[in-house]
């Protein structure tokens, strides 16, 4: 999700793009322009990194839950970010190898 938001943010920064102009116009018509604002996207990206970093710091697997807790899982989205090659600009290979 965070990687997708970063890609969307990068795409929207291309102000000379006809696609971006059309997308932003349609977003405004449908009252979704705030959702695509740079401020909102950056906030969501930052929140995504907060979650990923926290989960990686806790080991990447069902962080925060004991094995006996019904919420405990054997795999987690944070760990998926280590395995699946998403291009997260703030998480490098060295950081992933620390898990």
UniProtKB/Swiss-Prot annotation:
Superkingdom, taxonomy of origin: Bacteria
Listed name of the protein: Putative protein YgeP
Organism: Escherichia coli (strain K12)
Classification of source organism: Bacteria, Pseudomonadati, Pseudomonadota, Gammaproteobacteria, Enterobacterales
């Amino acid at each position: 999700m965070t990687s997708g938001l970063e890609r969307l943010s990068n795409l929207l920064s291309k102000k000379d793009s006809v696609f971006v102009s059309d997308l932003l116009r349609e977003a405004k018509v449908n009252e979704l322009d705030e959702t695509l604002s740079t401020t909102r996207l950056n906030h969501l990206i930052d929140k995504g990194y907060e979650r990923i970093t926290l989960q990686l710091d806790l080991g990447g697997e069902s962080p925060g839950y004991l094995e006996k807790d019904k919420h405990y899982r054997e795999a987690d989205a944070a760990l998926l970010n280590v395995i699946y090659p998403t291009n997260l600009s703030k998480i490098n290979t060295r950081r992933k190898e620390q898990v």
